[in-house]
Amino acid sequence: MEEARAYEELRVGFTAAVSHELRTPLARVLALLETAALPGADTAVLLDQAREQVEEMARLIDDILFLSQLESGREVAALGTTRALPVLEEIAGRLADSAERADVRIVVDAEPDVELPLRRRMLAIVAENLAENSIRYAGPGATLTLTARPSELVAADDGRGLEEDELPRLFERFYRSDRARASRGTGLGLAIVKHVVASAGGQVEASGGPGRGVRITCTFPAP
């Protein structure tokens, strides 16, 4: 009975959080469309901004569905192993433009033969979410290093860092630090990382502090 009650409270809380997260970009879309209908409005610019908000909602919905699949066990994270270096290099290349705009440098550190116990797609999802988090929040001039070692994947930046009491909350769904609230992002990236790693039998931990950057370590069982 207690377990059922706890599950229901979690479900209700998650539904409320999803509703809140969708309401904000939806309100922006409606405001932009109303403004676009006014005489003399720059319709092209306003419609482009509205499109960006719709794309943000689509990303949020995709993340919610993926997280739901992970939690229900319908999406399998661990199925064999994947060489880490090609995946990390691919992610670094894919995010090069956004990293350049944020003035964040990405470095990949992995030996060619290092493998991690995740399907390729899952390793890419983990690495991309870790990298995107640093790109958004580390601050200009920071360096993000993606490191793969046997049974370990680390994303460490030397950016602004966070208060130590915020670090354990990074993996909560929809959690954003005070500084991150104005930044774009679904608020689910690190929650997805945690669930993917956990479904492969691993653990995730964040460390760091103000002015010391953030280090996120994903540790997997030894083969």
Where are these regions (language model features)?
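Conserved catalytic submotifs in the C-terminal HATPase_c
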Residues: 78-80, 100, 105-115
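Conserved micro-motifs of the catalytic ATP-binding
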Residues: 72-77, 115-121
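Conserved glycine-rich
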Residues: 140, 201-202
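Short alpha-helical segment of the dimerization/phosphotransfer core of two-component systems
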Residues: 52-57
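Short helix-loop "hinge" at the ATP-lid/N-box region of the Bergerat-fold HATPase_c
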Residues: 134-135
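Short conserved segment of the HATPase_c
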Residues: 162-174
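Short beta-strand/loop element within the Bergerat-fold HATPase_c
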Residues: 141-152
